[in-house]
């Protein structure tokens, strides 16, 4: 409903809204679909939302029928309880069917119901040792980032902004990969495949899936794979503060300790340079780094009574 209101508010009238939709639907290049006239994809513009994928052709009849019924109910409420179309409709469905503006909005509601499950992001805040979901948000710009079961970035929020930080070395020209809630270290590949097909309608072909990487408990420690004793010693020295940082992160004692981010990043770089990734250690360092990023961001705090 908020998306519909935003669309009408931005366009000022249904005629302009129709013009926008026609331009987006007829756009040939999928890479720039939804971009504004200044050649930018704005998070706060409706046309950016309208250009997002729906996967209509991949959805089941049952799925589309349910969303269609929901759209009809929402449209009926809008028409009979508000003056969004200029006046309140009487409780008469035939009047809706013959109104071209009502048909337009009903179609958009149906489209948005297909856009949302494929494109929204949940945002969480640290609460104790876990994260609490605070809501979901539709950010067209973030939909440009593809998924990997072994992502190289992490998302967290600071104030009213979403921040994306690297958690693995990223070379110039390499792609940034987010994670859609399906990490190879905790979810086996067959289950990830099932989840992706059910919600996103695609088969993941990331490096973790192509290599069929084992979960965390099946990974090797670096000492099991490295024969050179001097390299082993160097890695052990680099990781000497790992347990200490893990304890500080667990107890939420990372305030004014930004140096920990730098040291953990160095650990990750050394492991990448000398250990066949992934390893148990690199997963451990990355998880601690993610925890610290979460703690320096927004936190969910319940006041003590």
Name the predicted role of every residue range.
Residues 294-305:
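C-terminal helix/juxtamembrane-tail motif
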Residues 2-30, 34, 147-291, 300:
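C-terminal SET catalytic tail plus cysteine-rich post-SET Zn-binding segment of SAM-dependent SET-domain
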Residues 4-158, 199:
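Catalytic cores of histone-lysine modification enzymes
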């Amino acid at each position: 409903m908020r998306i519909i209101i935003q669309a009408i508010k931005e366009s000022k009238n249904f005629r302009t809204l129709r013009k926008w939709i026609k331009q987006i639907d007829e756009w040939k290049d999928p890479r720039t679909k939804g971009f504004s006239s200044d050649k930018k994809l704005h998070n706060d513009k409706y046309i950016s939302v309208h250009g997002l994928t729906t996967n209509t052709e991949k959805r089941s009849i049952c799925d589309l029928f349910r969303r269609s019924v929901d759209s009809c109910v929402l449209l009926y409420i809008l028409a009979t309880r508000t003056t969004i179309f200029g006046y309140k409709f009487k409780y008469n469905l035939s009047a809706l069917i013959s109104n071209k503006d009502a048909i337009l909005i009903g179609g958009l509601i149906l489209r948005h119901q297909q856009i949302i499950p494929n494109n929204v992001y949940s945002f969480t805040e640290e609460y104790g040792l876990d994260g609490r979901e605070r809501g979901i948000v539709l950010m067209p710009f973030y939909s440009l980032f593809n998924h990997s079961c072994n992502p190289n970035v992490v998302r967290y929020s600071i104030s009213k902004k979403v921040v994306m930080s690297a958690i693995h070395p990223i070379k110039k020209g390499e792609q940034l990969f987010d994670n859609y809630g399906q990490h190879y270290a905790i979810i086996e590949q067959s289950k990830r495949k099932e989840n992706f097909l059910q919600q996103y309608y695609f088969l993941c072909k990331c490096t973790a899936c192509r290599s069929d990487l084992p979960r965390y408990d099946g990974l090797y420690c670096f000492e099991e794979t490295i024969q050179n004793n001097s390299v082993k010693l160097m890695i052990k020295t680099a990781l000497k503060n790992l347990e200490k940082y893990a304890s500080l992160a667990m107890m939420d004692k990372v305030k004014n300790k930004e140096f920990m981010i730098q040291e953990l990043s160095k650990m990750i770089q050394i492991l990448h340079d000398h250990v066949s990734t992934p390893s148990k250690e690199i997963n451990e360092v990355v998880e601690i780094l993610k925890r610290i990023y979460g703690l320096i961001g927004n936190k969910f705090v319940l006041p003590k009574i």
